């Protein structure tokens, strides 16, 4: 499965790339203008078409998990260790060790992850592509990846760039004396840039806060082009108190609490140094996206001095946090807490801090005869002045083993957060312990039901008296909580019966509880009488109930179809479900159920595409599911919007037939905001009501083209078959065991 992500506007995404591409004039003569140039408000469907399998040079049959499992990972680690201390003349290693450089590479690759939409992270190795490869915060990481190219070249398809970069960060830490928590492979590479909304700014380092001073959702970085926060302080203001607020908000949106945040910063800044030998504005050239072809994808060429080594310029900040930057020590915390720090400036003019009693005690990274003072960023000093962070720092300083474990676990979380549940992890170094942020599931201690059991359970469900539309809504609500951006949610675990999902407004809690009670009664009755060791989970029963209702609706339409069903889901407990962590999965809009909160800033149609992209759907799959769910009367809140049929509950193509019927004229309702009325063109009689999501399948030229296929006289059976296929896909989105088997 490939991750799919949507930006707030493709125009904005293109603008960020274009402003880096200084060598090519925007819309040069002869270059085609996209439709977005002429009509920026048109519905953009490109998020449903990116990461197409045809873009993958390994082909559609390539199985990365199978390839990775053939890898001699110890041999890879050995090659990484050799690379760490083999300094290259074209980019010399600080202190003779690339370890800190590679830690930064891995950190910045994973650190783009954000909880609100699950986008970003190490998966896909997006750091290779624009805009991330040209962000100011990723300056010179192009060299880190080039240093790793011989290893990637050697092992080819057996290890992805995403896995290699994270593994290299781990090996770097271990080579410098730190014990990591573990490593899981499984990050498949992307082959093109993601469409991600990184902020409204049109230039790098612009503030990502809204007019009220709040960091815009779903963003996590405080300024355009940064991974987290500005190390000099908010917008370059060296205010440690304000910086602490930024740190807490940014890291919190990346799923880190105060302890994890402190551990990550303190652990990471134990190693390496910052680079600000001179002013970036005067010395440094274009980022990779704006460099000439002769640069071969490298950027930030430095014309001052040698342009490398002692003359390296990255952030403009200069210096190290400890006197031993290539070994794990407690010096960062000791230095931070025990010195009085005063504001100063780097040789490049950047705000940073030095001890009040500064001495030249830090070895030079390239000349053993030189020494320098210690330094700290404003964001480091923030950890000392903020009461909560300071208390944690002092505790870690007094208890080094606690600090080591906290850093190891926080680093593991940082680099694995977007990999999804533990079932997706590959390799022998996966920790045995389950962590709450992995959304753990129990192991089934029983045998799975067989075909005869499935048939009997479907019979019992359909005879239970639960309305078929409610069975469909419950199954959809359970499975469609999945998001392909970070592989969270889904039907496995039956977390729809647990907090917080059981109280989400979109799930109609009152109706949901009745359906779940009926299904639980069927489950207990079935399991109680078994003597053969077979049991059925509620998670399986929820999906089976929806599938049985779909089959019944297809029969009403005249088609005898069998919805594929694979048992194997289990039931999670409330203790295995972090309520706050799952809260960010709550939909504020679901076009498939015609649900939309007016507090949303984006349109219902845009958010439908966003949701479809998180469900890994194509344009035809999204289209057939919307039409089918309307026919099945599966709207949230029992809404009649878009139910363009006189036979709800029948799996018909009526939605498309009636939407495209020219005898109907659509107008905005004068009494209900966000509602449209379809009236008979001749008589004016009201026939239907619909939402903007419904009408976009007739107004968008691309969606209308697909809708016409399903509205055609010869499309009845195709519609049913395609709906069943798309439905089954959604039901199985989190069945990683099926994809591996």
UniProtKB/Swiss-Prot annotation:
Q: Where is the signal peptide?
A: 1-28
State the EC number(s).
1.11.1.21
Task: Tell me which residues bind heme b.
Answer: 269
Q: Which terms are listed as keywords in the entry?
A: Heme, Hydrogen peroxide, Iron, Metal-binding, Oxidoreductase, Peroxidase, Signal
Q: Which molecular function GO terms apply here?
A: catalase activity; heme binding; metal ion binding
The alphabetized list of GO BP terms reads: cellular response to hydrogen peroxide; hydrogen peroxide catabolic process
The protein's required cofactors: heme b
Q: Where is the active site?
A: 108 (proton acceptor)
Q: Which InterPro entries match?
A: Catalase_peroxidase (IPR000763), Haem_peroxidase (IPR002016), Haem_peroxidase_sf (IPR010255), Peroxidases_AS (IPR019794), Peroxidases_heam-ligand_BS (IPR019793)
Q: Where is this cross-link: Tryptophyl-tyrosyl-methioninium (Tyr-Met) (with W-107)?
A: 228-254
Query: What modifications does the entry list under PTM / processing?
Result: Formation of the three residue Trp-Tyr-Met cross-link is important for the catalase, but not the peroxidase activity of the enzyme.
Annotated site location: Transition state stabilizer: 104
Regarding protein family, the annotation reads:
Belongs to the peroxidase family. Peroxidase/catalase subfamily.
Please explain the role this protein plays, according to its UniProt record: Bifunctional enzyme with both catalase and broad-spectrum peroxidase activity.
Describe the subunit structure: Homodimer or homotetramer.
Q: Write down the HAMAP family for this protein, in alphabetical order.
A: Catal_peroxid (MF_01961)
Q: What is this protein called?
A: Catalase-peroxidase 2
Organism listed in the record: Burkholderia ambifaria (strain MC40-6)
Underlying gene: katG2
